[in-house]
């Protein structure tokens, strides 16, 4: 039997009613109260997520920038200390190794945050391409991550932080902030489509911080949230999930994150030729939104048809808690990607009518 990995918060899940599942080799809570309740809490008040399964890699040294420019698609030279950047790592054929966040903590000090299922693969990929005086260290086991997300997230977190959180703008961060006396890196980032913060602290401090935040946020409606709501929230906001919208066979351009690919940067990064070609002349496939008109919920890998021609497949789908509609994301032949194109999805051996719709499905009002 495979032993599942656990985050430093595992022992407190039960106290809050956490129901755990196997998620890519990790024993993580899929929900605490209910996915719907947690989803709605984040859209209307706030939710707290344990995302300590995510990986963290430190890149340091004189050649750290030159190295990162070679292995990621975005232009890291534009990043200032205190800034975060969303980017991807690609194979030479343009397929995606992973999507990630880069935090610039110092002129020669970067923190990379990578997907849990890819930690070993990413670390090996980075280490095998390291150049000059750059070092790559996997610090995943030492770092815990909590995400507090939702319109009331700032007010709740402000109760246990003396620094003015309004000063931390979107995709910016402050290092060594004290959160209820615990040193942490606090960034205004998230994976829900709402305002919020991601808090990085030492593994041994995570449980105390989790309990304190839930305590001080209770009157504002802060709820403990699991993977289920995290997935429906990111899906409504059309944020890609590695293994579904992104993979070794799907390029960032196809997945709709071309904004994180800077083919005009001088550095010759992995996948640049393919991605440049796709940026200039269009990719063969495109990630689109689909709404099911008849009964049925589109799920990952369900085929999409026009007539007898299979034009692609669903990458993610659900009954949207916010929109009360059955919607999906599908990677399809670009010829059929125009909004209002009528398609069919095969759900349990039955074709159901659907239509291509604009994305994101949900965008918060400022």
UniProtKB/Swiss-Prot annotation:
EC number: 2.1.2.10
S-S bonds: none
Catalytic activity: N(6)-[(R)-S(8)-aminomethyldihydrolipoyl]-L-lysyl-[protein] + (6S)-5,6,7,8-tetrahydrofolate = N(6)-[(R)-dihydrolipoyl]-L-lysyl-[protein] + (6R)-5,10-methylene-5,6,7,8-tetrahydrofolate + NH4(+)
Gene Ontology cellular component annotations, sorted alphabetically: cytosol; glycine cleavage complex
GO molecular function: aminomethyltransferase activity; transaminase activity
Keyword presence, RNA-binding: no
Keywords, ordered alphabetically: Aminotransferase, Transferase
Alphabetized HAMAP family for the sequence: GcvT (MF_00259)
Function per UniProt: The glycine cleavage system catalyzes the degradation of glycine.
Name of protein: Aminomethyltransferase
Native species: Bacillus cereus (strain ATCC 14579 / DSM 31 / CCUG 7414 / JCM 2152 / NBRC 15305 / NCIMB 9373 / NCTC 2599 / NRRL B-3711)
